[in-house]
């Protein structure tokens, strides 16, 4: 699996370098993309601190809202991996403000809300749990609206819990 992952990472890097050379872009855009590419590489290797540094530099240089949305989304992924769910939600939300067509951000927000609902149940607070589950349902519905047929487990959960309309 890691060999295949490394092959994909190397392929991405080669393609990215070719694109940087042939697509007309400003030097700032090229520099931003270079930081983004380096951030993705570090993230795929589990070097989250290095990835964040690269993403923050890319954010400083990148002006296109669509491109910024993917940088913000990846920052959210890192915070999710680190268990920093509040920060992750903030970054996913900021990504969606710039690009409302990121079903993966809606899905990840739903997963975090669902997890928090399960935590609330374990703590004996069913009212708080229901609020988290309702929020998870809203995010999953948005993800499913954007990509019908994806997120099958979420779709089934929505049906089973009576949250699917």
Curated annotation (Swiss-Prot):
Q: Name one Pfam family in it.
A: TPR_1
From the Swiss-Prot or TrEMBL record, state where the protein is found.
Plastid, Chloroplast thylakoid membrane
Q: Name one GO cellular component term.
A: chloroplast thylakoid membrane
Q: Entry's InterPro entries?
A: PSI_Ycf3_assembly (IPR022818), TPR-like_helical_dom_sf (IPR011990), TPR_rpt (IPR019734), Ycf3/AcsC/BcsC/TPR_MFPF (IPR051685)
Lineage: superkingdom: Eukaryota
What residues form the membrane-spanning segments?
Answer: none
Q: Which keywords accompany this UniProt record? A: Chloroplast, Membrane, Photosynthesis, Plastid, Repeat, Thylakoid, TPR repeat
Sequence ranges of the TPR repeats: 32-65, 69-102, 117-150
- Signal sequence span per UniProt? none
Membrane topology type? Peripheral membrane protein
Task: Report the record's Gene Ontology biological process terms.
Answer: photosystem I assembly
**Family that this chain belongs to:** Belongs to the Ycf3 family.
Summary of the function given for this chain in its UniProt record: Essential for the assembly of the photosystem I (PSI) complex. May act as a chaperone-like factor to guide the assembly of the PSI subunits.
The protein's name is Photosystem I assembly protein Ycf3
């Amino acid at each position: 699996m890691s060999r295949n992952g490394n092959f994909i990472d190397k392929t991405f890097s080669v393609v990215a370098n070719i694109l940087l050379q042939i697509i007309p872009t400003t030097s700032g855009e090229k520099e931003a993309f270079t930081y983004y590419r380096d951030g993705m590489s570090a993230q795929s290797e589990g070097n989250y601190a290095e990835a964040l540094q690269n993403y923050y530099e890319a954010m400083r240089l990148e002006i296109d809202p669509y491109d910024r949305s993917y940088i913000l989304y990846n920052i959210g992924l890192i915070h999710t991996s680190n268990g920093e769910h509040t920060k992750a939600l903030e970054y996913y939300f900021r990504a969606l403000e710039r690009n409302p067509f990121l079903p993966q951000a809606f899905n990840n927000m739903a997963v975090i809300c669902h997890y928090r609902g399960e935590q609330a149940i374990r703590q004996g607070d069913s009212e708080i749990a229901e609020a988290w589950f309702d929020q998870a349902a809203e995010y999953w519905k948005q993800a499913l609206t954007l990509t019908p047929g994806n997120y099958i487990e979420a779709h089934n959960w929505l049906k089973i819990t009576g949250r699917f309309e």
